[in-house]
Design a protein with these regions (language model features):
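Short secondary-structure boundary/capping segments
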Residues: 15-22, 72-78, 129-133, 176-180, ...
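Active-site neighborhood of glycoside hydrolase catalytic domains
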Residues: 91-113, 120-234, 244-247
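Noncatalytic linker/hinge segments flanking ATPase motor cores
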Residues: 45-48, 100-103, 204-208, 235, ...
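Aromatic/acidic polysaccharide-binding cleft in carbohydrate-active enzymes
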Residues: 222-284
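Structural recognition of the beta-strand scaffold that forms the well-ordered cores
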Residues: 1-5, 56-60, 112-116, 160-163, ...
Length: 284
C-alpha cells in the first residue's frame, strides 16, 4: 500500500487549484507535528489494513515539505526542470520524512519503505502546475538518497529506501541506478529499485531490452513497477476495454521486465469519465 506523505501548503502561497491535488502535511510550518492532519487519507489506510491482506506500507513523497523548498510551494520550481528542494535542506527533508514514518511504526503501522522522490525527470513547475512534484537531475537523485541513507544509518533504522520511481523505463532510469549503486551506504538501504511503466504501452521491444538490462544489472533485493495507468485515459476504468489493456500491461511488465510487484494508479479519484481511478469519490 503506497501512502502519500503530503508536503503541506500555505493558502496565500499556493498555485495548485484543485484541492484533490494539494495535501496537508503532518508537519507544521514551525517544525512541530500534528498527526490529526490528512485524516481521511489515514482513515482510508486504516480501513485497508483492517482487511488483513496488506503487510507492507510504502510512504512516498511527491515533494519535500513546503518549508524545505525554494519557492515555499510543493508544486515545483518557478521554472521547468529545476529542483525545488533547497540545497541546504536535504538533511531536513530526510529527518522530516523518516520522523513521520517512524511515528506510524510506533503506532503499529507496517511501514517498511520510504520513497522520497517521485518521477524525478519530469518538469514539475514552470507556469503550469497541477499537483505536488519536484524535479531532480540524476546527481540530485543521488545526493538525496545519500542523505536519507546517512540519516537511516545514524538512527540504525529498520526502514529501507524505495525508488527513485522514474516516470518511465527510458530517459535517465539506467543512469539513476548506475549512480545509486555506486555508493555502498545507499545500497545498504536501497531495498527496492522502482520505476513507473509509462510511455511503453505499445512498445514491447523497449520492455524486453529494459528487462534484459535489469536482469544483468539490478542487484537490489526487490525490483518493482510501482505505478501505471492508461495515459491518456481513452477508456474508463470500469470498462472491459480498460481491463484488457491493464491485464496486457501487467503481463508484459511481469514477463518482459521481470518485476517483483506491480501497482496501479490510482485507487480513488474525483472523475467519472475516462478516469484513472478504480473508485469515484465526490466532494459531497
Amino acid at each position: 500500500y503506497r501512502f502519500n506523505v503530503g508536503g503541506g501548503y500555505e493558502k496565500d502561497n499556493l498555485r495548485i487549484e484543485n484541492p484533490w491535488r494539494y495535501v496537508e502535511s503532518f508537519m507544521n510550518k514551525d517544525g512541530t507535528f500534528d498527526y490529526s492532519k490528512d485524516k481521511y487519507a489515514v482513515k482510508m489506510m486504516k480501513k485497508c489494513l483492517k482487511l488483513g491482506n496488506i503487510d507492507t506500507l510504502i510512504f512516498f513523497a511527491n515533494s519535500p515539505h513546503f518549508t524545505q523548498t525554494v519557492t515555499g510551494q510543493t508544486s515545483g520550481g518557478f521554472t521547468e526542470h529545476f529542483s525545488n528542494l533547497d540545497k541546504s535542506k536535504y538533511e531536513d527533508f530526510a529527518k522530516y520524512l523518516i520522523d513521520i514514518a517512524e511515528h506510524f511504526i510506533k503506532e503499529g503501522y507496517p511501514v517498511k519503505y520510504i520513497s522520497p522522490i517521485n518521477e524525478p525527470q519530469w518538469k514539475w513547475g514552470g507556469e503550469s502546475v497541477w499537483q505536488e512534484g519536484c524535479h531532480y537531475e540524476p546527481k540530485e537523485v543521488y545526493d538525496c538518497f545519500l542523505e536519507f541513507a546517512k540519516e537511516l544509518e545514524k538512527r540504525k533504522s529498520s526502514l529501507k529506501l524505495y525508488g527513485p520511481e522514474s516516470g518511465n523505463i527510458k530517459d535517465h532510469t539506467k543512469e539513476y541506478y548506475k549512480l545509486l549503486s555506486s555508493n555502498e551506504l545507499i545500497m545498504k538501504y536501497l531495498d527496492t529499485f522502482a520505476y513507473h511503466s509509462y510511455g511503453s504501452d505499445e512498445n514491447v521491444g523497449e520492455k524486453v531490452e529494459f528487462g534484459k538490462w535489469a536482469k544483468k544489472n539490478i542487484k537490489t533485493p526487490r525490483f518493482d513497477m510501482s505505478e501505471w495507468c492508461e495515459l491518456p485515459c481513452k477508456h474508463d476504468t470500469k470498462s472491459v476495454e480498460s481491463s484488457l489493456i491493464m491485464a496486457r500491461i501487467i503481463g508484459e511488465d511481469l514477463i518482459y521486465t521481470g518485476v517483483d510487484s506491480w501497482s496501479a494508479w490510482v485507487c480513488v479519484n474525483q472523475w467519472d469519465n475516462y478516469s484513472d481511478g478504480f473508485l469515484v469519490a465526490k466532494d459531497d
